[in-house]
Regions:
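Membrane-cytosol interface segments of multi-pass membrane proteins
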Residues: 1-242, 251, 263, 350, ...
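Regular secondary-structure segments
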Residues: 107-114, 274-278, 326-329
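Juxtamembrane/transmembrane-helix interface segments of polytopic membrane transporters
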Residues: 144, 148, 152, 274, ...
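Membrane-interface helix caps and helix-loop-helix hairpins in membrane proteins
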Residues: 190-195, 248-257, 303-313
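Membrane-interface helix-boundary motifs at transmembrane edges
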Residues: 217-225, 276-288, 308-311, 336-341
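Acidic, glycine-rich loop-and-beta core segments that form the ion-binding/anion-interacting portion
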Residues: 250-258, 262-275
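Alpha-helical transmembrane segments of multi-pass integral membrane proteins
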Residues: 263, 267, 271-272, 291-405, ...
Length: 440
């Protein structure tokens, strides 16, 4: 998803979540004095964390392939045979997004929002998040709404949505969707959104609204030793990692408001991982070790998922995500260069759009196959699968290039940013004084 930051300078380019935070042009973490993030004052000019942008694309593809299992009997069959245990745990890609969101939002905004609560700064942050998330989401909600108008003339809402619970299509249901509040009123995620994975947008929007208050606490912990912060990150994830079906603390099915525990644990864990990464210089961490460490951690996650074999026990892998993200943020050398490839960067920047559009094409594929005259043979299934994959790629590009980014820039331009307004006032004051209009 999904999931879902505009500094007072150039437009940012990175964004982890289906709710998709961007990096506000953030610098490499823990890379020495020249790149060190101030502990109490924000820097205003920062390069992108390209490695995390690439990770966002990988996480989005993980979720997409998890949902594409309806096509596992097409030409994609070899992919699913080879990576079945990993793809079966594709819902963990959502947790990657949530942890990334906490990490990058904290890295970008902690020093702006943390020292003390200011309504203007908090409002600027919330508006930046709204401008990033809402336009593309609202458009997809509208398209899916038309899809329901067409389909429910023949099928029930529940059947047409391909969910176990029917989403609310009433005017109030539409209002909840457009306000991105649709998950807040439900104990479970199924049926909360008009399209399955849309629940993550609502969850992440709630996390963003809470962050200005959370930042007040995190700012007081910003000088934690990196090992202590990393330990806090892992401990924060324990409730969502060990409690559930087929986990060390087993439950009978999913529990009410489990989604709230999931977003809270992952987002806060990402925040602590950020504190650990930005303080890495305190333990004289060698950035040259970050790349190999990230590769080792990622490999360990894949091996663990392949061994676990099913989504229940595989959920324990979430405990490794803070370490993986922290190490990637510190990565230098060839791995950073490889992850900075243009196609990975574009995929990461457009990952929110990919997350939003892909499910619609899966719906199309399912219903076309089901209602195909005289049944769809292998050739038809392969052709439809190819068309749907191409449609996903094209729709992602169009939504990102012509809706998500332009709408974000226009909405941000409607409200002057705190930093920009301050600079404008200072410039006006200097100009006034230089013209002799000020007091001597």
């Amino acid at each position: 998803m999904f999931s879902v930051i505009s500094p007072p300078h150039r437009a940012p380019t990175a964004n982890p979540t289906p709710g998709k935070p961007d990096t506000d042009s953030v610098p490499p973490l823990g890379s020495g004095a020249e790149n060190r993030l101030p502990k109490s004052e924000p820097k205003q000019s920062r390069p992108d964390l390209a490695t995390l942008t690439a990770l966002r694309f990988v996480a989005a593809l993980w979720v997409v392939f998890f949902h594409l299992q309806a096509m596992q009997h097409t030409f994609l069959a070899p992919v699913y045979e080879l990576f079945r245990p990993v793809i079966a745990n594709g819902d963990l890609g959502v947790d990657v997004f949530f942890v990334l969101s906490g990490f990058i939002i904290t890295y970008t905004y902690l020093d702006r929002l943390g020292p003390r609560f200011r309504w203007r700064a908090a409002a600027d942050f919330v508006w930046a998040r709204f401008a990033r998330m809402w336009p593309a989401f609202a458009l997809v909600v509208g398209v899916v709404g038309l899809w329901f108008v067409y389909g429910t003339a023949q099928e029930t809402v529940r059947e047409w949505s391909l969910q176990t619970q029917a989403p609310d299509l009433s005017p109030w249901g539409l209002a909840k969707q457009l306000l991105m509040m649709h998950l807040w009123f439900q104990p479970g995620t199924d049926g909360a959104s008009w399209f399955g994975p849309g629940w993550t947008v609502s969850a992440e929007w709630l996390a963003y609204l809470a962050f200005p208050l959370l930042a007040l606490v995190l700012f007081r912990l910003r000088r934690m030793h990196p090992l202590a912060a990393l330990a806090a990150s892992v401990l924060t994830l324990l409730p969502t990692a060990i409690w559930g079906p087929d986990l060390p603390i087993p439950t009978d099915g999913h529990q009410p408001y489990e989604w709230l525990l999931r977003i809270a644990c992952c987002f806060i864990a990402g925040a602590f991982a950020c504190i650990a990464a930005r303080n890495a210089d305190r333990m004289k961490f060698n950035p040259a070790l970050a790349g190999p460490g990230a590769l080792l951690t990622g490999t360990a996650v894949v091996i663990f998922l392949a061994t676990a074999g099913k989504p229940g026990p595989g959920r324990l892998a979430v405990l490794a995500f803070p370490l993986l993200i922290g190490l990637l943020s510190l990565t230098r050398g060839w791995l950073r260069s490889a992850l900075s490839a243009g196609w990975l960067q574009y995929g990461g920047r457009s990952s929110y759009s990919l997350y939003l559009v892909h499910m619609f094409f899966i719906y199309l594929f399912y219903w076309l196959i089901r209602d195909w005259p005289n049944g769809a043979g292998p050739l038809v299934e392969n052709l439809l699968a190819t068309a749907c994959l191409l449609g996903i790629a094209l729709a992602t590009h169009l939504l990102f290039k012509y809706v998500e980014e332009p709408a974000r820039l226009r909405l941000r331009a409607l409200v002057p940013r705190v930093g920009a307004a301050r600079v404008a006032r200072a410039t006006a004051a200097v100009g006034h004084s230089s013209r002799g209009g000020g007091r001597p």
